[in-house]
Amino acid sequence: MKNHYSLWVMEYAYVAQQPTSLFVYGAHNQGHRKMPYGYIVIKGGGVTATIDVGYNHVAYGKEMAEMWGVAGWQPPQTVLAEVGVSPSDVSRVFITHAHFDHMGSLDQFPNATFYIQERELSKWVWSMSLERRFRWLMLGIDPADIMKTVDLARQKRLVSVDGDREDVLPGIDLHAAFDTHTWGSMYVTVRNDGARNSQNSWVFAGDLVYAHENLRGTDPSDPQYVPVGLATGSQFSLIMTAEEMTKRAGGDFTHVIPVHEERLKDLFPSRITKAGLRITELALADGESSRVR
């Protein structure tokens, strides 16, 4: 099957022991597992893009990472070099949501135009305006990231998206998922054959999905949707969005990609870098060499 884009999941840090209840709603006292932190590289047709950018291990980003036990952090320059890319090569960045581990390295991508849902940005500004007793709503948010995003608008480097948008790049669509993991989360579909009714779609879920259990439950003989364990919005919205994403992936849950799922390595080719981080290779465009073999 021909692919228009090469697709990689790039781990840039991790939490070695994350409670399972963060991955799966209600899974209390069910142990711990590794939680990779990652972003997606899309390369093809003369374009290099990413889905999210990770966080920067300085200031409040570093403080939050240390509070949550994040280890192994590497900057985009180091991580992207493993697939022959530099941050300056990236021309488009699709921000799934504004949590620090997805949006904290905005200033490391000097030539990129950034896409974010208008609701995601405006509601975090609103949340910052609330009195201190509402501060749980800001869990996972670095206020400096919000201000940097506003400044990107001043620089004319921000596209404020209102709902769904097709073909932001050829075969790449943005889909709103309001009031789910965050106020204005979105996910990204790559129709890698370029067809409108694609037989080769990949859905990049951001944090709408943390783990395979969110799409399949724990009983393979009787699958069900189970929400992630952390959300500003509703479990109902997360479940309905899981159904929508699965349909966009042609019913193949393995084509719905959660960057926090360590077990992607069991489904796709991967390797560990010298820094101890994993690259997972989902697809290779024509003429692209494997970065994991």
Residue locations for each model-derived region?
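Divalent metal-coordination and catalytic microenvironments
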Residues: 7, 42, 52, 90, ...
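Core dinuclear metal-dependent hydrolase active-site scaffold
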Residues: 9, 39-43, 162-197
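Conserved beta-strand hairpin/beta-sheet module of binuclear metal-dependent hydrolase folds
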Residues: 14-78, 186-206
